[in-house]
């Protein structure tokens, strides 16, 4: 019901904030708008783009933190970005 949906949204928002924090910690200038699940970051390497199929517009990419995107997945994306600099 509504409470279950609310819990999913709260977790997505928390994971989006976690993604921003983890990306910032490795020197990536990631950000998101308040109450948004979209994390914006500078365009990563082609290796990362190909592996994770990130959407790109010119020199920026974004990650949509949907319910299937948990902290473990974010950690893997961040590790790949750190291991494959532009």
Where do the PLM segments sit?
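Conserved C-terminal alpha-helix-loop-beta "cap" of PLP-dependent enzymes
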Residues: 3-86
